[in-house]
Amino acid sequence: MMKIALCQMSNSGSVSENLKKSIKAIERAAADGAQLILFPEVQLTEFFPQYPGQDVAHYRIERDSPVIKAFCDAARDNHIMAVPNVYLCENGKPYDASLLIDSDGDIIGRAHV
């Protein structure tokens, strides 16, 4: 049987602050024996969909960004699968995405939300 951790977190407008919270949640979940951790929608930002018309371009994250690498490294270092949700930008097009990162730190799946 797989132990799954669900992360509920209070987000701010600071990507770096929310990333630190997310990495700590990965570490905590792994220490508690979870094999998979799931995160809330757009976890690295304030929940901007509730503010229509707001400029959110600064929240875009490229797939090869240090932020994504930090999630991959944390999953690998803690031997846990992780599903972060980010405002990803590929080919100039932003979208809400959940990434499936395996315990080796590799992105093995992606879902547009």
Where are these regions (language model features)?
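Short polar catalytic/cofactor-binding loops
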Residues: 8-14
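Conserved small/polar residues in nucleotide/adenosyl-binding loops
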Residues: 111-113
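Extreme N-terminal starter segment of soluble prokaryotic enzymes
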Residues: 1-5
